[in-house]
Amino acid sequence: MKLLVVDDSSTMRRIIKNTLSRLGYEDVLEAEHGVEAWEKLDANADTKVLITDWNMPEMNGLDLVKKVRADNRFKEIPIIMITTEGGKAEVITALKAGVNNYIVKPFTPQVLKEKLEVVLGTND
């Protein structure tokens, strides 16, 4: 299963990718910002999950989510936002934009596992 991780921090991308690898997800694409993420998503339409930060240069995560949701190819792709923006207003804004689940940094691998299971419908 192909996943796309978007974060301007190479350290955070590595942490997320390593966590996904331990969970059995090996086909993980990476992008540094929303513009690069859109290009990768456009070229890899078989991507099954998008995991994105909010605050990034060039195109932030919220604008990326809106662009993804506006494209019929990706209307149903599960999106998890992982960000430091943890206020109620931010969560509501993200959910209204089309985010399926929300994780506030810092987070544990267990939280990412559970959120992935929820968006993929594999939770028991």
Curated annotation (Swiss-Prot):
Chemotactic response regulator protein that modulates the rotation direction of bacterial flagellar motors. Plays an important role in the colonization and infection of Helicobacter pylori. Upon phosphorylation by CheA, interacts with the flagellar motor protein FliM to cause clockwise flagellar rotation and bacterial reversals, as opposed to straight swimming when CheY1 is not phosphorylated. This is Chemotaxis protein CheY1. It is found in: Cytoplasm. Mg(2+) binds at D7, D8, D53, N55. The lineage of its organism: Bacteria, Pseudomonadati, Campylobacterota, Epsilonproteobacteria, Campylobacterales. Its main location: cytoplasm. GO terms for biological process: archaeal or bacterial-type flagellum-dependent cell motility; chemotaxis; phosphorelay signal transduction system. Interacts (when phosphorylated) with FliM.
